[in-house]
Amino acid sequence: MNNQPIPSSELIINDDGSVFHLHILPEDLADIILMMGDPGRVSEVAKLFDTIELDKQSREFHTITGTYRGKRVTALSHGIGTDNIDIVMTELDALANIDFQTRLPKAEHRRLTILRIGTCGAAQPDIPLGSYILSHISIGFDGVLNWYKDGESIFLMDFEEAFVRHMAWPSRFARPYFVRSSEKIIEKFQDWTVKGMTVSAPGFYGPQGRSVRLALTVPDLIEKLEGFEFEGYRVTNIEMESSALAGMARLLGHDAATVCLAIANRHVKESNPDYKPLMKQLLLRALDTLTA
C-alpha cells in the first residue's frame, strides 16, 4: 500500500479536492483539534477564537479553523458513535499524511493532537454531577478496532482478560478491548480532571444498561461495571466514542484523549439537563490547556 497510490474506491476525494465526508481540504486542518459530537457546539467553541479562517459543514461534520491565543486550532464535530470516529480519524489522518495529488503517503509524518470533549454518565456513586473525567483508558464495547490488523499491538490484554472474566462477557457480544490515551495529553490535563477508565458503548440505551420498553441481556450492567477494578483503575463513566478515538490515534501515530462532563450518575440515577454553563467552562479550560 505504501508504494502504490491509494485507489479512489478506498479514499474518496471530492471534485473540489476535499476529503469525502468531512468536506475539508488538507490546508484547512490545524495541528491542534478539538472534537465534539454536536455540530452546534463547534459554533460555541468558535466564539472563543481570536480569529476564524474557515467555517464548513457537511452532514453532521462541522469544521471551524481559527486561532486561539496565537495558535491555530480546528474545532470539529464528529456526530455520535465509534462508527463515526472511524470515518473522522481516517479522514483526518488522510488530510495530514496523504498527498491528495499522488494518493501516496507523505514522506514526513504529521502528528496531530486531538482532544474530544463530550458528555457522559458517571458509573461510580462517588463521582458527582459536573465532574470532568479524563479517559486515561477506554474500554471499547463497539468492536471497531477489532477490524484493524495491528489493533492487538495496542490493547491492554491483562485488563481485557480480567474484565471478560468479571463481567461473564456474553459470547454473542463483540470482544471488548482496552486502549490507553495519549500520555502527552494525560500529563497536560490530569491536574484538574478525574482519573478515568471509560466505557464506549455502541448505543445509548440497551448497550448502556438503559431499558425503556425492551428487556436487556445484561440488566445489571451498571452494578457489574461499578465492581470492576484492575491495577488501580475503576470504571468511571460511559459514553460512545473514546475507545475508537484513542485506539485509532495510537495506530495512526497521533495524540488523542477524551474529557467528558458528567451530566448523569447511572448508579444514583440522577441527571443534570442544565449543563451548558459547565460545558462552556470545560471548552474554555480545554482550549487554554491545549494551547499552553
Annotated model-derived regions:
Residues 21-26, 202-208, 280-288:
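Intrinsically disordered, low-complexity segments enriched in small residues
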Residues 222-232, 238, 242-248:
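A short, acidic, amphipathic alpha-helical segment used as a generic capping/interface helix at domain edges
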Residues 35, 39-42, 78-85, 89, ...:
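Generic structural signal for well-ordered, non-membrane alpha-helical segments
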Residues 121, 138, 199-206, 244, ...:
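Glycine-rich beta-alpha junction loops
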Residues 265-292:
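His/Asp/Glu-rich mid-to-C-terminal helical/loop segments that flank catalytic regions of hydrolases
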Residues 243-275:
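Zn-dependent metallopeptidase/amidohydrolase metal-coordination segment
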Residues 2-177:
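Metabolite-binding pocket within alpha/beta catalytic cores that recognizes anionic/polar moieties
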Residues 158-230:
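Active-site rim beta-loop-alpha module in soluble metabolic enzymes
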